[in-house]
From Swiss-Prot:
Locations listed in the record: Mitochondrion matrix
Disulphide bridges: none
Superkingdom to which the source organism belongs: Eukaryota
Region spans: Disordered: 124-147
Record's protein name: Uncharacterized protein At2g39795, mitochondrial
One Pfam short name: MAM33
Comp. bias regions, Acidic residues: 129-141
Organism: Arabidopsis thaliana
GO cellular component: a single term: Golgi apparatus
Similarity comment: family membership: Belongs to the MAM33 family.
Amino acid sequence: MALAWCVVRRSASKFASVYGGRVRSISAVANRASLARNPSSIRPFVSRALNYSTAIDRISSEQTLIRVIDSEINSALQSDNIDSDEEMTPGSFPFRIEDKPGNQNVTLTRDYNGEHIKVVVSMPSLVSDENDDDDDDDEGPSNESSIPLVVTVTKKSGLTLEFSCMAFPDEIAIDALSVKHPGDSLEDQLANEGPDFEDLDENLKKTFYKFLEIRGVKASTTNFLHEYMTRKVNREYFLWLKNVKEFMEQ
């Protein structure tokens, strides 16, 4: 009788062990099937991991950008092209200089024999001579810097001569000349553009160049402006770098 009871207990124990293992296996399969049918139960964990990874990448990218900007700022500081231009302005320079940081133009003003003269100076650009392909004919650099100028000479009555010019090293080229009456509308100003300057008589053109030279718009002035505006380009770039860095650090 005892032997039979022992056999029964062993069989029951073995059955429970096997059955329990099958139950655990079935439960695991059921859980995986449940997750497959309802992935939202694991989505919060995946979402948090992705958000964390994205935040780390963003911070790393911004820190790298700030380091590169700092390097550019240090390079600019080591250059003498962002210093103040007050010391480099020649004593004989006849114009007052109005230069606001962040403004792409510089304004020169002076009064001469009852006339008010204003020169608006724009940023320099590089002019490339695309037609000069023969190296044997090169007598100098094929690229040169040019500065757009708008010169206005205004009488006390308000009547104005406006010159559109391009300043090259040691040379000024007048592109257009127009007369502006006080109170003229934009349509009137466009109507008073006048003839193409290149079509004028050579003596008349020379007279207008002399007219500007007497009022201080001459080669020595534009040579100074080339150096001044080159420094301004560097100063504006330095200011832009500082503003970008300030944004990235906030």
